[in-house]
Amino acid sequence: YYLSEAAKLDNSEKKLTFAARLILENMKREDNPGKKVWEAQTAATLFEKALELDPENEDLKVGLGSCYVYGEGMIGNAEQTMKGIQQLLQVVQKDSNNMKAQLVLGIGGVISNQYPKAIERLNKVVSFDPHNLEAVSWLADAYAAEGDKQNAVKWYEQSKHLVNNPDFSKEIDERIKEVQNH
């Protein structure tokens, strides 16, 4: 909280961006819906203030879109998911190889049940960076939701290789069983 207030008072793009990114990363790991919403709104405000200082900064636009998708979008607010997707689409229309934007668009596609588009975007990210665990995991989930068991299992197996942790592998094996039994 104090970091965000200090950044607003200082009003430098660097400090606003630092605070926004820190809050965004914390928000992505937050389980409490109330805290997640507060962090999303706080980070979004900081990204908006930074964008006022540097309106062409694509990373700031991706950060702002991410706040909407990972924040209220992740807990079921479709309007916020779409708001984030619109923000991110502006970025990929200028640069289709912006993998940060493609990743969050892919995640937004899964959240909003737009699986074919999500799969397309997430495949683009993993072809660019095959070790991107977040993209691989969401891609597996997207294929599972689409009913494509073979690809879901393939990407779940890939995630096990990337993490190489027995507890994680056990959890993924359970998920694979669920996919195969549906």
PLM feature segments, named:
Residues 18, 22, 63, 104, ...:
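Canonical tetratricopeptide repeat
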Residues 10-30, 55-73, 100:
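Amphipathic alpha-helical repeat scaffolds of TPR domains
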Residues 9, 53, 94-95, 128-129, ...:
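Structural marker of alpha-solenoid helical repeat scaffolds
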Residues 15-16, 60, 101-102, 118, ...:
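TPR alpha-solenoid repeat register
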